[in-house]
Amino acid sequence: MGLFSRDKPKIKIQTTKKDGFSGWLKCTHCNELIHANELEQNSNCCPKCDYHYRLSTEDRIKSLSNPNTFKPLFQNLQPVDTLNFVDTEPYPKRLANAQEKSTSNEAVVVGTCMINKHKIALGVLDFSFMGGSMGSVVGERLTRLIEHALKEKLPLIIVSTSGGARMQESILSLMQMAKTSGALAKLHEARIPYISVLTNPTTGGVTASFASLGDIIVAEPNALICFAGPRVIEQTIGQRLPPGAQKSEFLLEHGMIDCIVKRPELKQKLAELIDFLKGNFSEENEPSPPPKNLIKKTSPLKDKN
């Protein structure tokens, strides 16, 4: 049996379950009934147990930016099948299927917007597009966004959710790790703030590159953040990790991230962080102390499993 000809595993995508009553859903985490409108008003977080469901790029941008201020950039960059890669199906067919199912034409949307009073450069990865995997176009769009932030002296925010580097682009996808990291080094030298927001899941080459290079690293509650996931580690070394060892609460306790922020509070917290960072990164200003309660630990969200 060939490497790419094996049977496809049945993968279940976690979503809210529809109940028999119109407009009502059952939370897959706590099994409580919630109304769809209530879920939407709470930024797609369960109002009963605070479980954070995934957001589309469109909804993520709406939740973070002031209304009608987002202006997309570099949307003309499109993926190509440089390697003529075929696994269970040709890479161009995978791309076409992903573009048909998603509101995005690639796994990242970049642009500029306003967050409260601040104009910022914003990048949002899309997990619904091939698992948010980083290929050449994802790396190039992010690099150009970083260069745009450098040119215009805009604070940069990247919201990550990804399975890592894109297998179908092989070494070309791995090259994006170095390219994005090099661009961020120039941004840091120019003293322009970069905030990295990690959502569930953020893994692989994305975790090992730009997602971990923020001046401040923010995470959503109970997010899986790692390089290799628990299943891969278990298959490799034959041992299970301790419960929650790769979740954002564990990483906060061990100094890998700076704070955990619930999604409904994220926009305001980012605005406060930009206020603080702009003052400290400006060459004209003396470093100022952080505002009270700017960064604080939150109680861990208990995992259902």
Curated annotation (Swiss-Prot):
Pathway: Lipid metabolism; malonyl-CoA biosynthesis; malonyl-CoA from acetyl-CoA: step 1/1. Keywords: ATP-binding, Cytoplasm, Fatty acid biosynthesis, Fatty acid metabolism, Lipid biosynthesis, Lipid metabolism, Metal-binding, Nucleotide-binding, Transferase, Zinc, Zinc-finger. GO terms for biological process: fatty acid biosynthetic process; malonyl-CoA biosynthetic process. Its cofactor is Zn(2+). PROSITE patterns: COA_CT_NTER. It is found in: Cytoplasm. It holds the Pfam family Carboxyl_trans. Residues 281-305 are annotated as: Disordered. Binds 1 zinc ion per subunit. GO terms for molecular function: acetyl-CoA carboxylase activity; ATP binding; carboxyl- or carbamoyltransferase activity; zinc ion binding. Residues 23-292 form the CoA carboxyltransferase N-terminal domain. A zinc finger (C4-type) spans 27-49. The keyword Cytoplasm applies. It comes from the Bacteria. Zn(2+) binds at residues 27, 30, 46, 49. It catalyses: N(6)-carboxybiotinyl-L-lysyl-[protein] + acetyl-CoA = N(6)-biotinyl-L-lysyl-[protein] + malonyl-CoA. It is an enzyme of class 2 (transferase). GO terms for cellular component: acetyl-CoA carboxylase complex. The keyword DNA repair does not apply. Its EC number is 2.1.3.15. Belongs to the AccD/PCCB family. NCBIfam families: accD. Acetyl-CoA carboxylase is a heterohexamer composed of biotin carboxyl carrier protein (AccB), biotin carboxylase (AccC) and two subunits each of ACCase subunit alpha (AccA) and ACCase subunit beta (AccD). Component of the acetyl coenzyme A carboxylase (ACC) complex. Biotin carboxylase (BC) catalyzes the carboxylation of biotin on its carrier protein (BCCP) and then the CO(2) group is transferred by the transcarboxylase to acetyl-CoA to form malonyl-CoA. This is Acetyl-coenzyme A carboxylase carboxyl transferase subunit beta. The gene is accD.
